[in-house]
Amino acid sequence: MPKAKTHSGASKRFRTTGSGKIVRQKANRRHLLEHKPTSRTRRLDGRAVVAENDAKRVKKMLTG
């Protein structure tokens, strides 16, 4: 049986916290920011916790 591999795309997009939660970056803050209000870009700052149902699938991809 070959070694299980981590999904490389998922490993770039998700991170696990110390408590075991999976976090992600918020969308819509990469480019074309000129016309977006500053309040919106601030709101999109930081990380967001992945929803429970999605977290199960993401965990499977990260553990390999």
UniProtKB/Swiss-Prot annotation:
Record keyword Transit peptide present: no
Protein name: Large ribosomal subunit protein bL35
Sequence ranges of Basic residues compositional bias: 1-15, 23-33
Family, as annotated: Belongs to the bacterial ribosomal protein bL35 family.
Record InterPro entries: Ribosomal_bL35 (IPR001706), Ribosomal_bL35-like (IPR021137), Ribosomal_bL35_CS (IPR018265), Ribosomal_bL35_sf (IPR037229)
GO CC aspect terms: cytosolic large ribosomal subunit
Bias (Basic and acidic residues) ranges: 34-46
Single biological process term from Gene Ontology: translation
Keyword annotations: Ribonucleoprotein, Ribosomal protein
Residue ranges of the region described as Disordered: 1-47
Origin superkingdom: Bacteria
Organism: Mycobacteroides abscessus (strain ATCC 19977 / DSM 44196 / CCUG 20993 / CIP 104536 / JCM 13569 / NCTC 13031 / TMC 1543 / L948)
SUPFAM superfamilies documented for this protein: L35p-like (SSF143034)
GO MF entry, a single one: structural constituent of ribosome
Pfam families: Ribosomal_L35p
Keyword Acetylation recorded: no
